[in-house]
């Protein structure tokens, strides 16, 4: 016990020295999280041995120490990969690398230069919410673990960033309006200035034209979007603290797509369930090729979609859309495979919907990753 107490004291002394040093070097932040990990590992072991106190330190429950140790391991590994990137020489403080910053939206990304974004739902001060937009967002590529620095952006649809030409929303004002608003309208303010104000419903929102003074705290994001996106949509402002170029009003309405931004379809064009356009090998199959709107004999059947594709890709996609649960779908399954048959290792994730209308809305709004197929169908309802 004395050996454990002395090691714990040494670990805590190292942590105090790091706090007093208040370094802005990334290697010191990695060392800090390594010590946090070691501290919780020792407390976990002490609790396993039946100890409730080690010196002056109260030993927490096993689950508490285990959870904190796992969090420390996750952050430490993320910082170690960041150390191998081109951004390791930037200033990284304890505040920049804390757990709260790691888990703040967008989750599992590093963020800098936060700025408050005020959104008034229904135009009422009683229904306003404050969100944090980030000037710089450090995103890790899921394929090769490399880090990329992208600017945080804001428009009338929400807070987002663009990575590899794909728009990733981490705050969707339309979905937030379902929670905090009634009429489906809202107003976005950055730095005390109104940059967008909606006067119609969520589905027909148009950005208000802003002058140079209104957009003065923001900067054009033309360098952050692809040539295709800039050719069809307005360039949203970023949240970086630098000079900006005025943006032009969007020529057409826009709609938020999970993981990407698509142009709103023409109002004269009807999209029927099971007939959503697919691009880049993303296809949607009909459960019944003769009539996609067929009835179902089982009164307890509920509409579902089986997403088919590579297991890791499906897991990442499910993680991205789970924040929109109850709005775009009811629940999602874990990744599953067929146990026997033709030996195909294709994975599936099943999404459950409360109605055919909700499923149709999902197919219309959600952008599927490349290689993922959506297979609509029905399942018997069960708890």
From Swiss-Prot:
It is found in: Host nucleus. GO terms for cellular component: host cell nucleus. It holds the Pfam family PPV_E2_C. Residues 303-383 are annotated as: DNA-binding domain. GO terms for biological process: DNA replication; DNA-templated transcription; regulation of DNA replication; viral DNA genome replication. Its main location: host cell. Keywords: Activator, DNA replication, DNA-binding, Early protein, Host nucleus, Phosphoprotein, Repressor, Transcription, Transcription regulation. Residues 233-297 are annotated as: Disordered. Phosphorylated. GO terms for molecular function: DNA binding; DNA-binding transcription factor activity; nucleotide binding. Coiled coil: none annotated. Residues 1-202 are annotated as: Transactivation domain. Binds DNA as homodimer. Interacts with protein E1; this interaction greatly increases E1 DNA-binding activity. Interacts with protein L1; this interaction enhances E2-dependent replication and transcription activation. Interacts with protein L2; this interaction inhibits E2 transcriptional activity but not DNA replication function E2. Interacts with protein E7; this interaction inhibits E7 oncogenic activity. Interacts with host TAF1; this interaction modulates E2-dependent transcriptional regulation. Interacts with host BRD4; this interaction mediates E2 transcriptional activation function. Plays a role in the initiation of viral DNA replication. A dimer of E2 interacts with a dimer of E1 in order to improve specificity of E1 DNA binding activity. Once the complex recognizes and binds DNA at specific sites, the E2 dimer is removed from DNA. E2 also regulates viral transcription through binding to the E2RE response element (5'-ACCNNNNNNGGT-3') present in multiple copies in the regulatory regions of the viral genome. Activates or represses transcription depending on E2RE's position with regards to proximal promoter elements including the TATA-box. This is Regulatory protein E2. It comes from Human papillomavirus 57. The gene is E2.
């Amino acid at each position: 016990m004395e050996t454990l107490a002395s090691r714990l004291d040494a670990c805590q002394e190292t942590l105090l020295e790091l706090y007093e040093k208040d370094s802005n070097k990334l290697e010191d932040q990695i060392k800090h999280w390594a010590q946090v990990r070691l501290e919780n590992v020792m407390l976990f072991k002490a609790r396993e041995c039946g100890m409730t106190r080690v010196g002056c330190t109260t030993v927490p429950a096993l689950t508490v120490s285990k959870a904190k140790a796992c969090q420390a391991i996750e952050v430490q590994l993320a910082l170690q990969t960041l150390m191998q990137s081109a951004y390791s020489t930037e200033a990284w403080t304890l505040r920049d690398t804390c757990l709260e910053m790691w888990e703040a939206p967008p989750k599992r990304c590093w963020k800098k230069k936060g700025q408050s974004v005020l959104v008034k739902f229904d135009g009422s001060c009683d229904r306003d919410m404050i969100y944090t937009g980030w000037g710089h967002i450090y995103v890790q590529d899921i394929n090769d673990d490399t880090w990329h620095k992208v600017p945080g952006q804001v428009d009338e649809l929400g807070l987002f960033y663009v990575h590899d030409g794909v728009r990733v929303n981490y705050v969707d004002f339309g979905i937030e309006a379902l929670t905090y608003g009634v009429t489906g309208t809202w107003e976005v303010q950055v730095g005390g200035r109104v940059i967008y104000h909606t006067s119609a419903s969520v589905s027909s929102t148009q950005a208000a034209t802003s002058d140079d003074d209104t957009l003065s705290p923001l900067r054009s994001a033309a360098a952050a979007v692809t040539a295709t996106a800039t050719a069809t949509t307005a360039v949203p402002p970023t949240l970086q603290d630098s000079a900006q170029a005025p943006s032009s009003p969007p020529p057409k309405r826009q709609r938020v797509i999970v993981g990407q931004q698509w142009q709103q379809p023409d109002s004269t064009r009807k999209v029927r369930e099971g007939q959503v356009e697919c691009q880049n090998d993303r296809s949607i199959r009909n459960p019944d090729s003769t009539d996609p709107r067929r009835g179902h004999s089982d009164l307890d059947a509920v509409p579902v979609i089986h997403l088919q594709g590579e297991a890791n890709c499906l897991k990442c996609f499910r993680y991205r859309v789970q924040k929109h649960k109850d709005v775009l779908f009811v629940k999602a399954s874990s990744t599953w495979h067929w146990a026997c048959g033709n030996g195909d290792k294709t994975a599936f994730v099943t999404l459950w919907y409360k109605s055919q209308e909700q499923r149709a809305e999902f197919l219309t709004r959600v952008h599927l990753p490349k290689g993922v197929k959506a297979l609509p169908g029905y399942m018997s309802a069960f708890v």
